[in-house]
Structure formats: C-alpha cells, structure tokens
C-alpha cells in the first residue's frame, strides 16, 4: 500500500472516529452526561448539581455560575426535543422551561470589555429559516434578575412559537406577576448661590427666525421609502396580569391583552387592551409601511389619575403620512374638549388646519369651580409660513369677573401680529395690539388700552372707573434685554377718590434704569419716584405724602409721610430714610404709629443706624403695645436690640457681633433674651455664641438652655449646622400643666416628661439623617370627662423612642397602666426611601376593660381582658401581620345594652395579608356566634366579612320592648361598598308603649342645621355606599300593647338599602287584637300593613269593630282605615248596611237611634267615656304626685251598667280598683295582689263578694 493511501486511510479513520465521538457525546444520554460533567469540571465558576434524562427529557438542577460581577443560580432547567422531527427536516422543541432563576449583575465589579467596532450596514436585513422551527412550550417560573440597581422579577410566563421561512407566529402567551423596579433618580445637589452675571450677546448665535425659516423651508417629514421588515410577525394572543413598574413613578397593569400581526409591511392591531392603576386603554388599527403610508388607528382610554380621574379620551388617526394626516381627539369627563386637525407633513411650510372646540372648561376639574370658560373656539388655518389664528371664549370665576375674550392674529415663521386682543368685562373693554418679531432679536411693540372699566357691580364695596393707555417696546437677544415704557397713563376714580398715574421709564439687563418721572395720585394721597440707577452713579428720590388713606382701599386707613433717598455709587451706596405713619389700619389689623429713621452708608464697610418704632399693634387675640428695633454700628462691630411689650407675647433680645468680609464670617452673641408667652415666661440661662462661616455655608450655635417654670430645654454641646452636622437637644423637664391653655375643659393632664434628641445629617451623601429621639414620662395621668363623668387614665410607665440608623427607621413604645395591663411594641421600616419593608411586633398583655367603669352609671360595669401578640411584615404598600389578638371574659352590663351579656370571647388570627375572626357573645338566654375573615393582599381593594348567627337571643329595651331574635346575617365590606345580607327571625316579642314622651315631636320638613359660623351645613352622606338585603320574619308569638291597641303581629319584611335609601318590602298582619279608645271596646277583625318603599309610608288596611257582646240587635259596627300612613282614610261601616247615623250610633252607644233607652242616659255614658279617654295622661300625673303608680281613669260596661273606674298601684305588687255606677251609684272595690309573676289573688267587694285566684297565660 502506497504512502498516500495510508495517509488517506488514517485521515478517514480519524474523521470517522471524531464523528463517532461527537455522535456518542451528543446523540446518547451517557455521552450527553459526560459533556455536562466535563463542563462542570473545566468551565470556571460553573457548577451543575444534577443531570437527568436525554434530549427527549433533559433536566438540569441546582446550577450555579459565579464570575466577577456575575452570579447565576438556577433551580431547574428542562429541555425536551422532538427528535422525530429531524427526519422531516424540521426542529421541534417540545418544552423549554426555567424555574427558580436568580441572576445578579454588578457592572462595577465586571472587568472592562473590549470595544466592539460597529459593522457597516450591508443593506436590508432578511431573517429566514431554511427549516421549520417549532417551540411548543416556553415556561419561566420565579425568575429574578438584578442588574446594578434595577430588578426584574417574573412570577410565571408561558408561550410558544412557530418559525417557517419569514413567518414567525407567537402562540398564545401568558405573563403573570412581572415586577420592574427601577432606581429612583438621585436628588440633584443644591447649587451654590453665585452673583448674577450678565450674559452678553454672542454674535455667532443663530437667530430664532432663521432657525424656524430653515425648519419649515422643507417638509417636516423627511423623504420616506418603503420599509421591508425582516420577518412576518403574528402575535396570536399575549395576556398579562399584575405587571408593575416602580421607581420615580409607580404603575401597575392589572391586565393586558395584545393581538397584532405584520405581513409584508402591512401592520394590523387587532386588540390592545390595558387596565392599569392609571387608567384603561383600548386600541385597534392598521398601518402600511409603503406607498403613502396610510394609517387608520382608533384608541379609547379612561384615565384614573388626579385631577383628570374619570376622563375619557377618544383618538382617531386616519389618512396617510405622506399625503394628508387627519387627527380627531374627543375628551369627555372633567375636561370636555374636541380637537380636529389636518396636516400635510410631507409638504414644505407644514400646511395645517387646527380647530379646538369646548362648550365648557372649568378649573379645578373637580370640586368647587374657581374658573370657567364657556363656548371656547380656537382655529388656526394656513401654513406655518403664513397662518391665521382666531379665538373666542367667555370666562368667569370666583375672583374673575365675567368677560368675553376675542383674539385675531396673523403670523409666519418670523413674526406674529396681534391685530386685536379684546377683553370685554366690567362694562368696558381692554384691548391689546402688539407685534412680536424674532427675525434677528426677539423684539416686541405693544399698546394696551383700558376703556370704560367700571367695577361698581362686581365690587360694590370698592367701585372704580378707569381709563388708560400703556405703550411698551423692547427686545431680547443673547441673554441681554432692554425695555421701555414711553407712555403710562391711568385716570379715573376709586370710591370717590381721584386716580391719576402718569410717567415713563426704561431699563435693561445691565440694571441701568432711567425714570424721568413717575407720579401716582389716589385721592389726597400721592407718591413720586424720579431718578437714575446707572452702572456706577445712584441718584433716586422717592417721596410719599398720604394724609388720608381712609377708604383709599377697602380696609385701609391712616396717614403716612416720608422720604427715601439713594445716593452714592454701586460700590458705595448710601440710603437715607425717614418715614412716619400714624393710625394705620388694614382689615382687622391696626397700628397707632410707625416711625422708621435710618442712615446707612456703604464704602469699604457698611455702617450706619436704623431705628424702627411701632406703637399699639392690635388685631383679634393680639395686643402689642410697643415694638422697638434699634440697630447701629459697622461690619466690624454692630449690635441690635429688639423690645416687645404686649399680649400674648412680650420680651426682649440683644444681638451683638462682627463680620469679616475677607473670610465671609460673622461672629456674635445672643443675650439678655426673655419672653413671656401663654405657657409662661421663657429665658436664657447663658448667652448664646453664634458663628456663621459663609464660605463653608455653616453656622455654629453654642451650648445654652431655655427655662420655664414648667420646663427646661437645653443644648449641651455646640451645634454645627450646615451641609453636614449634628445636634443634641435635652428636654430635662416638661410638665403637662403647660398644655392646660390649649386643652379643652373636658381634658386634664398631669405629669412630667423628659427626653433627648440626637440627630446627625450629611446632605453631600445620599440617604436620610441619622439620629434617635427618646421621651419618658413620670406620674403621667390623663382625665377625660365623658358623659359628665371623669375617666382617669394613669401611667406607671410611658416611654416612646424613635430611631433612624443604617437606612432603617424604628418607632418603639412601652406603656404600663396603673393597676392594669401593658402595651409594648416597635415598628421598623427598612429602606424608607426605597422598598420600605416593614418589621416589628406589637404586644398587649392583660388590658382590662374595667378601666372604663368610672364613666358608667351605678350598677353598670365592663369586664374583659385584651391580649395580643402581633408581628409585622411586608412593606408599606403591602403590609402583613402575623399573630393573634384575643378578648376574653367580655361582660358589659349597662342600661344601654339590649341584652344581659355573659362572659364572652373574641379572637382574631392574622396570617400575612389575611385574617380570621371567631367569637361568641353569650347572653342569659341564647348566644351569638361570630365568624369572619379579611384580606388586604391588594391594599387598594381590601375585603372584610363578618357573619353572626344566633338562636332565640333575648333582647330587652326597657320599659317597652322584649323580644327573642335569631339572627343569621353576613356583613361584607370593600373600599367601594358595604353589604348586609341574611335573615332575622323574631319568634317571640312583647312590645308595650304606654305613651310618647312629652318632648317627642316630629322633625320639620324645612329643618335647616347651622354650623358654628351659623352657615347651613351640607347634608352628610356615607363615604361608602351601603346595600342591604335583610329579611325579618315576625313569628306567631309577637304581641303589641300600644295606645290602647293590644294585638298579635305576624308577617315578613325585606329590609333593602341602596343609593336611594332605606326601604321595606313585605306585609305585617294583625290576625287578632283589641283596641280600647273613647270608652269603646273595639276588636280588630282585619289588619294589614303593606310596605313597599320608605318605612314610614306603609299602606293601611285595618278594620276594627265594636265588641258584639256590647252591641244590641246582633249588629256589627266598626271603623275601616285604608290608604297611606301619610293620608289615611277612615270610614264607618256596619253589617247589615245602614245609614251612617245609625252605624255611628251602634259604634258609640251599642244601640240604634230608635232604642227605648233614655237618650240622655246613653249620651251621658258616651260623653263620660269620651272625656275619660282624653284625661288619661292628666290622671297619671296626679297619681305620680301622690305616690300612686299607673293611676288610670276609665269606663266599663254598657248602657245602664256603665261604670267609672279608678285604678292604680299603691305598692309594687298591690293594685286597688274602685268603680262607681253612672246610673245606679253602686260601688265596687277590687284588690289584686301579685303572688308570682303570673299568679294573682283578687278580692271583690260590692253587691256581691268574691275571692279569686288568677293565673295568666301567654300564647
């Protein structure tokens, strides 16, 4: 064999072995595991915990990769490849999932990378695959990536795709729980204050007019060619839930839906639905990236941000980008505006038609309107090189008089000419004509005219009539400006005072001002300003002569006269002032006299003197007799004295110091300082040393103390305050008696507090100040008067502390109540400026409810122990709580309780963002079981539920109501709605109403409630609406005794409440009953109360008949009441039917009109019955005076057997009844004694004698 053949054979064998090795390593499970094992060993920083399966089901677990600046931890990676697809020349991946991935990248620790040279563009990019690629499932679960200060977290993501040639289809995709936390923008350091410098014009600066001319000389939209996308993309459905972006702004997207496709440059948006914390967006549309680039987009949005909450936006974009683009915007809600625009972006000059229309615009958008513009029309037509602008509107507001505004203007890219801007208001008009030009410098020329302005109707307390003319011109170029007012005229009168303003002035940015003369006259008062302020020389005089300021302006009064002169140069100015004012008044403030006398010069040093004297300052709650300020000296040595005499504050201080201009340093002392205040006198114990260093922007305050008879506040060491510093303040003593002037009469406090504050800061570094504050109380006692009874609360220990260190804020407290329990706790907030994570605990031990017993009446009490052990977690946006709160042995006995409560329990268990409630309320008869839960995982959409279920719980409201109730109700609460559903059964009840209180009167329909300022109060409505759907079932053993009616009630009522108010639906029946009135004994034969709406407007259907046993001739006579409770209709009926007179006779007398009984006897019986019925309340009052309870006067019997009966209780269990016949004068004496609650012994003495034993039954 030749050498060539041997070499060829060797090469062939090597290639075959290499291919076989690669095939073994890649194509077999064993080989694949060997590859990962080698990578685990040889790749620096890579660690793979477990490898299972092959290509069809490959799983990698516990993967770690560490490199400088990069740390990757992967819990599980799964890959499933469909190898059978390879035979069909396609690539199929059945599953690619990543779980529990954590990536941390710190770019500062990464080595610098090599700079990559940018590749030159090689023409349009086309992406295409020669073989179909199918990715059936892609899944991400619990992915966390942190790059420097940016964090991205994904809770769950599933998707899939198909890629064939240029067509890429994204299968239905779901994304849940995305969080992108961006770093907040660092606060810009405070800039140092520097002297203003005048910026001179730059000759090479391009004028604005030339810039705009170049911009509009060619189309705004550049020449556009057809765009060919490298792929045809089809997103079938992309759904997202709970997507959140945090940082400087916090945005939460509750749901997202996207359907979009792009084929050969034809874009189609089938759906874009976004529901976020800031609003909702729905959009559809089409666009073509070729030819004229036609577009058709429709967008609807609802905003959820203040002040435009609830604003609806409709946007329509049509036309073509390269021809005419049409835009329509409709805003409705707090702001109602319609906008229509047509623009040709591809033409030079930018042809544009714009129209804005609004029927009404108000500010603020919600709440009370302070400003309103009606019928606003704005129109712009033409090109930017030649356009016409017009605007019309009518405005009004709280501080704005009604006015009509019109504007007509023309302009181009170099100037705008305001032909007329007219404001018609106050019975006159104001016109502005102006020309603004920016071809070279920005210059203007304008003329403002006031014609016939009259404020008499708008401000009747300050009527004025004004006319005037103001002309102005000026220019601005390169940061330098100049302005001139060649004519200023204003004439008229203000409240019978002549007004005259006349003058002219001019100035520039070099602070050169020339005032030839400025004269102001208001009635007898005048002021004049004349002079120059040049670059160096100063020569300005200002005089004021105001002998009659009374009523010159509303609330102004007094006299003033003075002179101010400015002389010298800018480097060495001199100020001379001599001003005197007497009897000054402004609104409720009055000053008897003000005198200012000063002479200040500035050469190499500022020196001079200034004296200010103010006498008798008075306004509500303030009465200052004298204030004097005296300052004199120079920079090197100066002093200031301030004296105040009056109420509520008086005192004095002395300040002396020196200033070194070279070092920009001032040093001084504050001494002889004391003040008298409503909380007592304050004074210094030593002079305060002050040192201000201007170059360092720092001030030092020496140690000192402030003392008060009830307090002492000390600074034990020097405070250096500047960009950084530290301050320590000790509160050695603070007696709560100081707070008495500020506390209501119903609150009293005593005790002493002491504390300390130590705070350090450094504004040159990011973060919050560092420090701590402690406060400790001794013998602290607070007494609050409740219901005219004192409620004392004494503390054995009362400590509060606050700490801020290492980017963590903490608040702690320790409270020990005298002869009671204790409350301890601490709350921590980590990273207060960032994530604001919560931590801490709250503990309550053996807190006894008996501490409120002092406010209860005699015989009333409260008992029970409150214990809690709670732990805080989560963050401020999503707080969490863990632990339990228990209330055991709760027993509240009081007249205000509707039931006799027995020891009961209540417990709440907290588990993160959820809690549960269990409890039982025990009574002497029956118990109520409580259960419930709450959820605040979404703090803005919290939810709470409480259910109550009981059986025959006795409710007593003495002395009128006793009933048994069996509730089965559920109360649910959300931020937007309260609901109450369920059923309440009343199987047994006794309702007794003897009489209404004398003071009980109905509320007038025109009642008006006034507040403390005697202004009508607005009716208060519930912040959260209440909906109820409650059924009340009245059982067969419910009886009522009220106003002579004794009856049994049955029926069902449905209690419903919504935004319209409370309503009742249902029927109450009276199957049996008796009604005693006007001496007659009526039986309820039929009784129905129909409810359908407001509870006080039932429909009545009641029939009451006279007792047939007391009616002759077997006649049934009665009264029928029908109609509504507001307008009932009563009629008399009889059976058999007869005339109204005959029926009335049977109803009142029990006999017909043709009866043989004497009419006088019958009439006597009837009148006595009517009179006795009306005298019940008077007789009852007489009985109470003589110690007889329930004394009553009534009639009994019919016809000749009629009697007048007096009855009453002379002892709690002994009733005496005495009756005398009306016609036979026979007397009957009855004694009834109660042996047991329902067992009576009765003795009757009259014509006959009897002794009876009676027992009362209830059915």
UniProtKB/Swiss-Prot annotation:
Q: What keywords is this UniProt entry annotated with?
A: Cell inner membrane, Cell membrane, Membrane, Signal-anchor, Transmembrane, Transmembrane helix, Virulence
Q: Would you tell me the protein name for this molecule?
A: Translocation and assembly module subunit TamB
**Briefly, what is this protein's role?**
Component of the translocation and assembly module (TAM), which facilitates the insertion and assembly of specific beta-barrel proteins into the outer membrane. Promotes the secretion across the outer membrane of autotransporters such as p1121.
GO CC annotation, single: TAM protein secretion complex
What start-end ranges are recorded for coiled-coil regions in this protein?
Answer: none
Q: How does it assemble?
A: Interacts with TamA to form the translocation and assembly module (TAM).
Record localization: Cell inner membrane
State the similarity comment: Belongs to the TamB family.
What is the documented disruption phenotype for this protein?
A: 50-fold reduction in ability to colonize mice in competitive assays with wild-type.
Q: Residue ranges, Cytoplasmic compartment?
A: 1-6
Is Ribosomal protein tagged as a keyword? no
Regions that span the bilayer = 7-27
Q: How does it sit in the membrane?
A: Single-pass membrane protein
**Organism field:** Citrobacter rodentium (strain ICC168) (Citrobacter freundii biotype 4280)
């Amino acid at each position: 064999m030749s050498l060539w053949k041997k070499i060829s054979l060797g090469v062939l064998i090597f290639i075959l072995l290499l291919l076989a090795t690669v095939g073994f390593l890649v194509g077999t499970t064993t080989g694949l595991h060997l590859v990962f094992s080698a990578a685990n060993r040889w790749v620096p920083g890579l660690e793979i915990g477990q490898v299972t399966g092959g290509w069809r089901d490959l799983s990698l677990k516990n993967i770690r990769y560490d490199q400088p600046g990069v740390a990757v931890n992967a819990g599980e990676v799964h890959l499933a490849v469909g190898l059978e697809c390879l035979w069909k020349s396609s690539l199929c991946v059945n599953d690619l999932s990543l779980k529990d991935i954590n990536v941390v990248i710190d770019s500062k620790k990464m080595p610098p990378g090599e700079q990559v040279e940018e590749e030159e563009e090689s023409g349009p990019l086309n992406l295409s695959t020669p073989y179909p690629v199918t990715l059936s499932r892609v899944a991400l679960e619990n992915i966390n990536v942190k790059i420097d200060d940016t964090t991205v977290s994904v809770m769950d993501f599933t998707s899939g795709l198909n890629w064939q040639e240029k067509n890429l289809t994204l299968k239905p995709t779901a994304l849940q729980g995305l969080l992108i936390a961006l770093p907040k923008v660092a606060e810009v350091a405070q800039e140092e204050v520097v002297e203003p410098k005048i910026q001179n014009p730059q000759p090479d600066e391009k004028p604005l007019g030339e810039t705009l001319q170049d911009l509009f000389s060619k189309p705004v939209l550049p020449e556009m060619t057809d765009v060919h996308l490298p792929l045809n993309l089809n997103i079938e459905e992309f759904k997202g839930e709970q997507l959140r972006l945090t940082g400087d702004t916090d945005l939460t997207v509750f749901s997202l839906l996207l359907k979009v496709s792009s084929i050969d440059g034809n874009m189609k948006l089938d759906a874009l639905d976004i529901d976020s914390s800031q609003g909702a967006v729905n959009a559809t549309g089409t666009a073509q990236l070729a030819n004229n680039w036609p577009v058709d987009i429709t967008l609807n949005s609802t905003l959820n941000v203040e002040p435009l909450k609830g604003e609806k936006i409709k946007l329509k974009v049509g036309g073509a980008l390269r021809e005419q683009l049409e835009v329509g915007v409709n805003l409705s809600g707090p702001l109602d505006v319609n906008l229509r625009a047509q623009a040709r972006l591809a033409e030079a000059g930018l042809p544009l038609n714009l129209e804005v229309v609004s029927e009404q615009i108000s500010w603020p958008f919600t709440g009370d309107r302070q400003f309103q513009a009606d019928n606003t029309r704005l129109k712009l037509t033409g090109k930017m090189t030649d356009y016409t602008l017009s605007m019309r509107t009518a405005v009004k507001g709280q501080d704005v008089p009604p006015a009509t505004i019109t504007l007509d203007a023309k302009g181009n890219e170099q100037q705008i000419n305001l032909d007329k801007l007219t404001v018609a208001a106050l019975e006159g008009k104001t016109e502005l004509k102006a020309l603004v030009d920016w071809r070279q410098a920005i210059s203007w020329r304008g003329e403002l005219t006031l014609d016939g302005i009259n404020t008499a109707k708008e401000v009747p307390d300050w009527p004025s009539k004004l006319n005037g003319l103001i002309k102005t011109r000026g220019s601005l170029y390169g940061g330098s400006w100049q302005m001139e007012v060649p004519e200023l005229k204003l004439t008229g009168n203000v409240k019978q005072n002549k007004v005259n303003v006349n003058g002219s002035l001019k100035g520039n940015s070099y602070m050169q001002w020339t005032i030839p003369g400025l004269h102001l006259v208001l009635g007898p008062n005048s002021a004049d300003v004349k002079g120059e302020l040049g670059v160096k020389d100063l020569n300005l005089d200002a005089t004021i002569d105001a002998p009659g300021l009374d009523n010159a302006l509303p609330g102004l009064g007094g006299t003033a006269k003075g002179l101010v002169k400015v002389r010298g140069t800018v480097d060495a100015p001199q100020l001379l002032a001599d001003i005197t004012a007497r009897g000054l008044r402004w609104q409720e403030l009055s000053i008897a006299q003000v005198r200012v006398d000063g002479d200040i010069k500035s050469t190499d040093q500022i020196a001079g003197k200034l004296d200010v004297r103010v006498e008798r300052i008075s306004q509500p709650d303030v009465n200052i007799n004298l204030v004097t300020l005296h300052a004199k000296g120079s920079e090197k040595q100066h002093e200031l004295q301030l004296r105040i005499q009056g109420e509520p504050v008086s005192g004095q201080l002395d300040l002396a110091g020196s200033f070194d201009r070279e070092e920009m340093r001032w040093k001084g002392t504050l001494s002889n300082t004391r003040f008298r205040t409503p909380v007592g006198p304050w004074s210094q114990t030593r002079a305060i040393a002050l040192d201000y260093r201007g170059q360092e922007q720092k001030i030092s305050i020496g140690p000192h103390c402030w003392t008060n008879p009830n307090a002492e506040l000390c600074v034990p060491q020097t405070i250096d305050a500047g960009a950084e510093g530290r301050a320590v303040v000790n509160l050695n003593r603070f007696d709560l008696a100081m707070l008495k002037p500020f506390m209501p009469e119903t609150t009293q406090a005593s005790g002493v507090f002491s504390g300390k504050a130590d705070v350090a800061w450094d504004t040159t570094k990011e973060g919050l100040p560092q420090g701590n504050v402690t406060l400790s109380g001794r013998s602290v006692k607070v007494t609050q008067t409740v219901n005219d009874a004192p409620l004392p609360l004494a503390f054995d220990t009362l400590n509060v502390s606050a700490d801020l260190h290492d980017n963590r804020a903490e608040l702690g407290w320790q409270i020990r109540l005298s002869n009671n329990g204790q409350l301890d706790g601490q709350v921590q907030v980590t990273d207060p400026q960032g994530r604001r994570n919560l931590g801490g605990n709250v503990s309550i031990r053996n807190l006894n409810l008996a501490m409120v017993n002092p406010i209860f009446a005699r015989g009333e009490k409260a008992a029970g122990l409150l214990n809690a052990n709670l732990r805080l977690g989560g963050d401020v946006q999503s707080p969490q709580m863990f632990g339990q709160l228990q209330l055991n042995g709760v027993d509240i006995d009081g007249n205000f309780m509707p039931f006799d409560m027995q020891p009961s329990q209540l417990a709440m268990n907290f588990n993160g963002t959820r809690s549960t409630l269990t409890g039982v309320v025990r009574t002497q008869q029956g118990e109520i079981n409580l259960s419930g839960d709450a959820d605040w995982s979404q703090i803005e959409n919290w939810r709470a539920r409480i259910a109550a279920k009981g059986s025959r719980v006795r409710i007593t409201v003495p002395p009128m109501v006793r009933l048994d109730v069996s509730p089965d109700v559920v109360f649910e609460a959300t931020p937007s709605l309260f609901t109450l559903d369920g059923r309440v059964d009343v199987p047994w009840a006794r309702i007794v109403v003897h009489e209404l209180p004398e003071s009980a009167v109905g509320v007038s329909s025109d009642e008006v409630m006034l507040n403390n300022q005697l202004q009508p109060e607005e009716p208060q409505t519930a912040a959260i609406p209440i909906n109820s759907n409650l059924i009340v079932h009245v059982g067969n053993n419910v009886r009522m005794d009220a106003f002579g009616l004794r009856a049994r009630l049955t029926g069902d009522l449905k209690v419903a409440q919504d935004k319209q108010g409370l309503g009742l639906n249902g029927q109450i029946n009276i199957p049996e009953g008796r009604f005693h009135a006007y001496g007659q004994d009526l039986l309820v034969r039929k009784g129905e109360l129909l409810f359908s709406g407001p509870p006080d407007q039932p429909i009545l259907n009641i029939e009451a008949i006279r007792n047939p046993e007391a009616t002759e001739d077997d006649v049934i006579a009665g009264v029928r009441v029908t109609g509504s409770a507001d307008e009932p209709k009563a009629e008399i009926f009889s059976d058999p039917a007869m005339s109204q007179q005959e029926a009335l006779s049977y109803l009142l007398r029990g006999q017909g009109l043709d009866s043989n009984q004497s009419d006088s006897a019958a009439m006597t019986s009837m009148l006595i019955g009517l009179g006795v019925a009306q005298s019940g309340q008077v007789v009852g009052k007489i009985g109470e005076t003589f110690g007889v309870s329930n004394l009553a006067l009534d009639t009994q019997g019919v016809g000749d057997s009629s009697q007048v009966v007096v009855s009453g209780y002379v002892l709690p269990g002994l009733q005496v009844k005495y009756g005398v016949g009306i016609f036979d004068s026979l007397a009957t004496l009855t004694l009834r004694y109660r042996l047991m609650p329902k067992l009576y012994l009765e003795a009757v003495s009259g014509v006959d004698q009897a002794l009876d034993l009676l027992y009362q039954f209830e059915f």
